[in-house]
Swiss-Prot record:
Record's keyword terms, sorted: Ribonucleoprotein, Ribosomal protein
A single cellular component GO annotation: cytosolic small ribosomal subunit
Organism per entry: Aliivibrio fischeri (strain ATCC 700601 / ES114) (Vibrio fischeri)
Gene Ontology terms: biological process: translation
A Pfam family: Ribosomal_S2
CDD domains per the UniProt record, alphabetical: RPS2
Family: Belongs to the universal ribosomal protein uS2 family.
UniProt name for this protein: Small ribosomal subunit protein uS2
One function term, GO molecular function aspect: structural constituent of ribosome
Gene name as annotated: rpsB
Length: 242
């Protein structure tokens, strides 16, 4: 499994925190100092903490666990979706609907509605409706897809959350905490690390930094899944001799 080096992090700007006046004192242990009134994150802590998180994600992947990638702010939205799709996992990248985890029974009903609409749009049902009815259903389907498209095939609660910006996604983190679902999160100098099981102290705004976290996390999950496939093949005697 690939690890992330300090050089990778420096190039992506992971070490740049927020302005000092916006800091959260709970992040003090992870701050190296300040430059031009901007906090500098101590990468000597971030590097091992992130690599430990990646090792744990690989472990979850090897057990066929489900990882939900969460990042709803504009800078993270597209990268979150890509990371989830690339690792065959799940995502929320538009808006976190309250109760997405803690009220999953209701969410499941909405997912069923979305899937019903998808079938109807393909099997000719929409064509039999009046233009107005068809338009209304199409709009409903698009709205549901935007909110739930990334979790429609999750089939139950995830085994872990990977979050970009602990502050912005505090509701998702709280719901995961209530259900005992482990949380991996990028926590900037203005955020509260409470409730995060695997803290990744780092810049949560720079697109290059966000892509670094997400690509590495997706690769870790994939490598874990591949290990599992290799182990099964070996057990069944399918491994080719070199």
């Amino acid at each position: 499994m690939a690890t992330v080096s300090m050089r990778d992090m420096l190039k992506a700007g992971v070490h740049f925190g927020h302005q000092t006046r916006y800091w959260n004192p709970k992040m003090k242990p992870f701050i190296f100092g300040a430059r031009n009134k901007v906090h500098i994150i101590n990468l000597e802590q971030t590097v091992p903490m992130f690599n430990e998180a990646l090792a744990e994600l690989a472990k979850i992947g090897s057990k066929k666990g489900k990882v939900l990638f969460v990042g709803t702010k504009r800078a993270a939205s597209e990268a979150v979706k890509e990371a989830a799709i690339n690792s065959d996992q799940f995502y929320v990248n538009n808006r976190w609907l309250g109760g997405m985890l803690t009220n999953y029974k209701t969410v499941r009903q909405s997912i069923k509605r979305l899937k019903d609409f998808e079938v109807q749009s393909q099997d000719g049902t929409f064509e039999k409706l009046t233009k107005k009815e068809a338009l209304m259903r199409t709009r409903d389907m698009e709205k549901l897809e935007k909110s739930l498209g990334g979790i429609k095939n999750m089939n139950g609660l995830p085994d872990a959350l990977f979050v970009i910006d602990a502050d912005h996604e505090h509701i998702a983190i709280k719901e995961a905490n209530n259900l005992g679902i482990p949380v991996f999160a990028v926590v900037d100098t203005n955020s509260n690390p409470d409730g995060v099981d695997y803290i990744i102290p780092g810049n949560d705004d720079a697109i290059r930094a966000i892509q670094l976290y997400l690509n590495a996390a997706a690769d870790a999950v994939k490598s874990g899944r591949n290990q599992d496939v290799a182990a099964v093949a070996e057990k069944d005697g399918f491994v080719e001799a070199e």
